[in-house]
């Protein structure tokens, strides 16, 4: 295990030396560059990493929102849905992997966690709230703000399956979100990244002042990143 860590570190450092320190890239050039240094052993995920000009200790300066990436994330998203009756049938038709009510709550309380996103009808939230300590720390608790607590569960399921993601700034003022796989055509990866960047800019808190996008980096999940020219975004 230690040897594997060393090998990964050497590969990372080798790729990192190729990145010119202090250089900024346009988004198209950044996508092209990362494709040139990609690890051919597996399909890496590209992420956009932001350092925002916010005061992260102020709740009214938190940047949070959702965005539907036009070309998806490249990852199969397992979606579960808490609903009953007609809503349950609609969620199943929309592609939900598991649909349930009290039985699904009990299943998760028993340790089952084979899912990536959660949708709930508002009338199920009394039951779903019992899972707060389980889902909350993992960022899986559904909420109206993220569009995952809604009467239109079918639409929410479809959007999540199609590549809608949630983003949220952290306690350091950073924000990190995936924008696709390096195997995507460069145009698709660029469009996804632009869509994500635009969504983060549009979600700028009203209380935030000054330079908002302090740094934006296009990175590899297991490798280095390159700084984007913020003025071009």
Predicted regions mapped to residue ranges:
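Long, charge-patterned amphipathic alpha-helical coiled-coil/hairpin "stalk" segments used as oligomerization
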Residues: 97-201
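Intrinsically disordered, compositionally biased charged tails
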Residues: 1-21, 207, 227-233
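Flexible glycine-/small-residue-rich
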Residues: 52, 83, 122, 179-181, ...
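Glycine-rich phosphate-binding loops that contact phosphosugars or nucleotide phosphates
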Residues: 90-97
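Flexible, glycine/charged-enriched surface loops at secondary-structure junctions
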Residues: 42-46, 203-215
């Amino acid at each position: 295990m230690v040897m594997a860590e060393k090998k990964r570190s050497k590969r990372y450092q080798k790729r990192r030396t190729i990145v010119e320190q202090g250089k900024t890239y346009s988004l198209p050039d950044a996508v092209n560059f990362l494709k040139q240094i990609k690890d051919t052993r597996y399909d890496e995920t590209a992420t956009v990493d932001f350092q925002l000009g916010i005061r992260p200790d102020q709740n009214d300066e938190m940047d949070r929102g959702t965005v539907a990436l036009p070309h998806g994330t490249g990852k199969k998203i397992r979606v579960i849905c808490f609903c009953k009756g007609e809503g349950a049938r609609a969620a199943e038709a929309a592609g939900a992997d598991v649909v349930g009510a009290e039985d699904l709550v009990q299943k998760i309380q028993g340790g089952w966690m084979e899912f990536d996103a959660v949708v709930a009808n508002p009338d199920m939230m009394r039951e779903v709230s019992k899972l707060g300590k389980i889902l909350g720390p993992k960022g899986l608790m559904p909420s109206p703000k993220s569009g995952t607590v809604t009467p239109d569960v079918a639409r929410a399921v479809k959007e999540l399956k199609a590549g809608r993601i949630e983003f949220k700034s952290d306690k350091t003022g950073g924000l990190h979100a995936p924008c696709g796989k390096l195997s995507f055509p460069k145009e698709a990866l660029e469009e996804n990244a632009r869509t994500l960047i635009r969504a983060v800019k549009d979600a700028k808190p009203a209380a935030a002042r000054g330079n908002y996008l302090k740094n934006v980096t296009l990175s590899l999940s297991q490798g280095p990143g390159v700084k984007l020219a913020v003025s071009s975004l």
